[in-house]
């Protein structure tokens, strides 16, 4: 599924840049659109093979959660290394809660991270919030994320 998403992103990039598609990309689009138009599939997602189990997490949310969790793990590795997972979770919960209450309301409109955040804790916090996954995360859930 993630290979298909990657291929679709490349197709999108090529279309926006007015670059020609590869034969494989053209084939993927043609077959998928034909399946959708002929009503062989109930949605474009199904036609493209982007399926998730009934009641499961949609692919776009799963991707956002993976990005968020990676940013939170990187934050812990860079700035909380050597501390117990519970201490890391508490520190990150404080950072993200404060950020949510103060700065995120301004930063959410930005498409690029502020330069001042580079190399700081806020860099990883901004990435986690920008991922699109629910934030801030409670301490208990942070312990689960950081424990992996």
Regions found by a protein language model. Give the residues of each.
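Low-complexity, PEST-like segments
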Residues: 1-110, 115-124, 130-147
